[in-house]
From Swiss-Prot:
Modification after translation, per record: Phosphorylated.
Gene3D superfamilies (UniProt xref): Nucleoplasmin core domain
Name of protein: Nucleoplasmin-3
Organism in which the protein naturally occurs: Homo sapiens
Function statement: Plays a role in the regulation of diverse cellular processes such as ribosome biogenesis, chromatin remodeling or protein chaperoning. Modulates the histone chaperone function and the RNA-binding activity of nucleolar phosphoprotein B23/NPM. Efficiently mediates chromatin remodeling when included in a pentamer containing NPM3 and NPM.
An example molecular function term from Gene Ontology annotations: chromatin binding
Keyword Repressor: no
UniProt modified residues of type Omega-N-methylarginine: 27
Region (Disordered): 141-178
Length: 178
């Protein structure tokens, strides 16, 4: 049993040495920055669609999190159907109705941070609106900028932590018990 424990400890020691950098021999993830901005647009009889786009060259991850759709001042008591045009998992464009708003029975709809990947187009399929769409534009960036000084410190830390673990030895039995 002691040999099995020693082998397990040696394996764990080897595993921690093979992982690069960081505290305890573990890889430290790149610093992540997350920014969040208000988003809003209005669809009406004059402006029947709106497209939310981001720059393709941007290395950041963009998410549009929708919070609410609501009829605003001047809306008639008619059905206002709003659809979202986006891409599915196969990168094919699909159109999905997300709201059917009517002033007398359902003037607003909470979407509880319904997340979409840009580009996204909102269309007023029926009705004259105005329909207000609100949410948050979230931008997540990972910084790969590591200074030379930080790299050297990580190498020194990993060298210090490469200490051989001594195997656990079984306790010696005492021969003469009364």
């Amino acid at each position: 049993m002691a040999a099995g424990t020693a082998a397990a400890l040696a394996f764990l020691s080897q595993e921690s040495r093979t992982r690069a950098g960081g505290v305890g021999g573990l890889r430290v993830p790149a610093p992540v920055t997350m920014d969040s901005f208000f988003f809003g647009c209005e669809l009406s009889g004059h402006t029947r669609s709106f497209t939310f786009k981001v720059e393709e060259e941007d290395d950041a991850e963009h998410v549009l999190a929708l919070t609410m759709l609501c009829l605003t001042e001047g809306a008639k008591d008619e059905c206002n159907v709003v659809e979202v045009v986006a891409r599915n998992h196969d990168h094919q464009e699909i159109a999905v109705p997300v709201a059917n708003l009517k002033l007398s029975c359902q003037p607003m709809l909470s979407l509880d941070d319904f997340q979409l990947q840009p580009p996204v187009t909102f269309r007023l399929k029926s009705g004259s609106g105005p329909v207000r769409i609100t949410g948050r534009h979230q931008i997540v960036t990972m910084s790969n900028d590591v200074s030379e000084e930080e790299s050297e410190e990580e190498e020194e830390d990993s060298d210090e932590e490469e200490v051989e673990l001594c195997p656990i030895l079984p306790a010696k039995k005492q021969g003469g018990r009364p």
